Curated annotation (Swiss-Prot):
It is an enzyme of class 7 (translocase). It comes from Drosophila persimilis. Signal peptide: none annotated. The keyword Aminoacyl-tRNA synthetase does not apply. This is Cytochrome c oxidase subunit 2. It is found in: Mitochondrion inner membrane.
Length: 229
């Protein structure tokens, strides 16, 4: 989900997303180098009038084009495996948020507090304010503290959904009868937008997600008002 005139990924708002962007750039660099090398070899092959009689059957060249791709794959696989383990690791979360996907809205529960739960619907275009984002703004945002480890539990009430926020590097499938979890750490304040990323019916495109990241003291005030109300 890119923003206006943006050809790359969104600006990261979590350490894990920063690592994902680094891995993307790392893999892209390797792919560009391979493309340039293969393009150069093909160019030289087409425009070269000489023939190498050992090219089609030579042990040295066969060893090179067998071992070299294996080494290149290792350079891609090792950072990828490291990232996979980092994404699955849960580091003593400060807050647990439960997200339940419905057709076609999200329900949220703050599991550490009593009676803090709400539904989050997309604001229709005809009710949107001038500074709102079409198909992205919701009536009830998720409010979370910055610089805190957050655990999110994701499930669904009807069909398979997917809770996704690109700026945080988070994508968790919500499956009926099953509870999936992941964690993230928001390192700056702001509004972060996401959408359901699993086709879930006619109004799949109208299930946005909005996270409002605030300092811890503001979050405490917000949660106190929510509990008292």
């Amino acid at each position: 989900m890119s923003t206006w005139a943006n050809l790359g990924l969104q600006d990261s708002a979590s350490p894990l997303m920063e690592q994902l962007i680094f891995f993307h750039d790392h893999a892209l660099l390797i792919l560009v180098m391979i493309t340039v090398l293969v393009g150069y070899l093909m160019f030289m092959l087409f425009f070269n009038s000489y023939v190498n009689r050992f090219l089609l059957h030579g042990q040295l060249i066969e060893m090179i084009w067998t071992i070299l791709p294996a080494i290149i794959l290792l350079f891609i696989a090792m950072p990828s495996l490291r990232l996979l383990y980092l994404l699955d690791e849960i580091n003593e979360p400060s807050i647990t948020l439960k997200s339940i996907g419905h057709q076609w809205y999200w329900s949220y529960e703050y599991s550490d507090f009593n009676n803090v739960e709400f539904d989050s619907y997309m604001i229709p275009t005809n009710e949107l304010s001038n500074d709102g984002f079409r198909l992205l703004d919701v009536d009830n945002r998720i409010v979370l503290p910055m610089n805190s480890q957050i655990r999110i539990l994701v499930t669904a009430a009807d069909v398979i959904h997917s809770w996704t926020v690109p700026a945080l590097g988070v994508k968790v499938d919500g499956t009926p009868g099953r509870l999936n979890q992941t964690n993230f750490f928001i390192n700056r304040p702001g509004l972060f937008y996401g959408q359901c990323s699993e086709i879930c019916g006619a109004n799949h495109s109208f299930m946005p997600i909005v996270i409002e990241s605030v300092p811890v003291n503001y979050f405490i005030k917000w949660i106190s008002n929510s509990v008292n109300s």
